[in-house]
Amino acid sequence: MPTFTPRNPAYEEAVRRTLLAMPYVQWLGLSFQRIAPGVVEFVMPIRPEITFDGKAVQAGPIGALLDFSGGAAAFTLAPAGVMLATIDFSVKLLAPAIGDRFMGRGEVISAGRSLIVARADAFASGEGEEIQVATGLVTMRVIS
């Protein structure tokens, strides 16, 4: 993974404030596990409301977790005072997301002035085992 220098010295506060103010982030129960330049990890509880059978997480919340993880990682490298908008994201489901804990990790792979691209991965864990359940790419546009 490349090493990045944040353009906003207060990037961590900006990421927390912006993401945690979003109603869907609040509803999903996302909480930050790690925020570093170009990297963000979220934890999301697995609740019956986001599953299709009471156990396995439905694809929509998995895609949202990837989008938020990659987008937040991108936001760590954005200049102060700008916003980011998702212009593209892909989701590849790899395994059923079953467990009691769900984690998303976003890692920036390219950071330009107008576009930032991040890889996003999702993992489910339960009973001491963690498996990767999805992967994707997220492209964000910097909006002044």
Where are these regions (language model features)?
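Non-catalytic linker/capping segments at the edges of enzyme domains
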Residues: 1-43
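HotDog/MaoC-like acyl-thioester-processing domains
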Residues: 3-9, 96-144
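Hot-dog-fold acyl-thioester-processing enzymes
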Residues: 20, 45-69
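A generic structural signal for short beta-strands and their flanking turns/coil linkers
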Residues: 26-28, 38-40, 83-89, 100, ...
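Hydrophobic residues in beta-strands and at strand termini
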Residues: 44-46, 93, 142
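Hydrophobic beta-strand-centered segment that forms part of the acyl-chain substrate-binding groove
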Residues: 54, 72-103, 108
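Residue-level recognition of specific faces of alpha-helices
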Residues: 62-64, 83-85, 90, 114, ...
